[in-house]
Amino acid sequence: MSKQVNVNFHQTFKPECQYISSILDIADGITWRSVKDISAVTGIPQGTSSGKVEPHISYAEYMGLVKSEKQIKLSRTDLGKIIYMEDPGLQELLTKTLLHAMILRQENGADMWSDIFNSIFPKYRNGIKKELLILELNQLYANKVTTKN
């Protein structure tokens, strides 16, 4: 891996069901939107330093719910269509568990989360300190891991 990887890739906030649900709601596969448009339509905050639109689109992609193209056209995946019909607000425990599993996939999931949960945590069943986690990640990511926000 050539680029530096930030342990805080999630921008120090967790995925919010209401925001992912809003992204799923507008993912029609037809409309091209800017980040500003998506923020206006969904109510997802998009300030200069506190933008949550793009990270939540990434979360939705990692969860296998949407596909996005760079000028931002969102379309629901087959899984996204089912979840949108059955649990559009992403409130059911089964939905949340499934989305957690999807984000941890080794292919198309969030790489670092996948590595943490699938490769590192199983070696430390009694817990792991942050310093050791960073050390393990640096071994996986060729010393490119940082904890800077």
What annotation goes with each model-predicted range?
Residues 1-149:
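Donor-sugar nucleotide-binding helix/loop cap in glycosyltransferases
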